[in-house]
Amino acid sequence: MEFNTLLMWIVGANCGMLLLRSVAARRWTGWATVALAIMLSMAAAWLIVPQRVGWVTAIPWTLFVLLPMLGNGLLGWLVARHRYRTAYLASQLFAWLHPFDGGWNLPRFVQALEYTFHGDLEQSRRLLSPIAHDRSALSNLARVLEYRLEGRWDELLSWIQHEAREQPLRDPLLIDGYLQALGETGRRHELLHEYQRIVLQEQRVDDAFQTNLIRMRVVAFCGEVAITEKLLAGPLSRLAADTRQFWLSTALQAAGQADQARVQFEQLASGPDRQLARRAQLRLEQPLTVVATERTPEELAVLNELARTIGHETHYAVMSSTTRRQTPMTWLLILTLLAVFCLEIPGGATDELNLFELGALIVPTSLTPGEYDRYVLAAFLHFGWLHLLMNMFGLLWFGGRLERAWGGLPMLCCYLLTAIGSIVLFPMELSVLRSWGWAGNDISILVGASGGVLGLIGGLTGHLLVGLLSGRSALVWREFGILALIVTLQTVFDLNTPAVSALVHTNGLILGIV
């Protein structure tokens, strides 16, 4: 398999998914514009230089999609940890690579966050004001932050309700601000009603992190301490420690545990984040009203559904999981593959004779009678560095998620059984295909951990399938759809790439699901 072919598939699949996501969300974004431009350039390159399509499109894709996406994730990580100087430098690079969706104003926005952190609200407002009125994707966030700076929740409600009268709220940031404003102004019944309508029934928020952030605010204002803790320790663990403490204290205060809440708010009031300190002081001076002991049937129904959904997704929504649980078994397997590859290098990692001597499987197996160890050894050998890197990446991405869901030993068993099992089945299946005249009679050499990687995908697919059958969750459905799309793309790729064994991949996938 040529690197150019691999690049073409990676770029095409990623840009296609960006376009589909924008269409599904009914929001045309700058990411979709860039993806469409790259897809059009790919079509043009196919007509002009078909042998270089991957290389031609990989350059703009790397510059204007991959690097901005990585930078966006890094920026969020830095801001969450209050590293604003480094975040400002990263935002400047991001602004040049992705000036759409308000990206050009991102450095000013990060500066405003830094001034807010230090308590300089005047400078923060000076920077936010022009962003808030430029009608970009960043303007809504800037405007919500402006209202939040001084706790102008009634004004925020009025503005968002005015926006909602003109067109339904679809921006997750506006929905978050709207629901928080309802909670801050003590309108808990309306908060639960609107959450049920906008988030549960109409499903207008499709981002997993933003959905859980909204859920956390709702349950905190409703005094549901246990659910708040579960969210903050799980899918929202990336939030800064002081932010998590603030919202847990909010839940405690709403639940009537005033003494515990007061101690934590007093700690935050003297903390380094001056904006959060001011909000904590307001909680001390103007505490939330305690939630009524008796709830209405509607409120109980929403909160029970919330608790059930969060528990269900914590167990089954493994693709978007942000838990910090370590994955040592995944890394052990990656290091093992790397160590075995080092043994290939002296004799040549693409030299078939060298691979044969190291334990590659030869088909028909009658050429190596009784050498059953080849079924195992072949699963750890790779034909060149590109083959190795692809499987290492797949193992890291899918294996880590399955290990967090199942644990290290079950994940290892799934990997080994599918990697070896897919190779054991291959000679028998190939023999049947040859007897039907659907495959040639050439001698084949088989190496690679691809069956194991597809087995991990199969394991994740089966895990999500159990989640679909055992409960209702839009997030689990969405993750199942993403995996189904990955499997479809992988199948199309296998069928169009002669050097790749579609049989082994299919074996691994099916064994993993089972």
Model-derived features: positions:
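N-terminal signal-anchor/start-transfer transmembrane helix
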Residues: 4-25
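Transmembrane alpha-helices and immediately adjacent membrane-cytoplasm interface residues
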Residues: 43-84
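Generic helix N-cap/helix-start motif at coil->alpha-helix transitions
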Residues: 64-73, 100-108, 133-142, 167-177, ...
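Alpha-helical repeat scaffolds
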Residues: 86-94, 121-131, 152-166, 187-202, ...
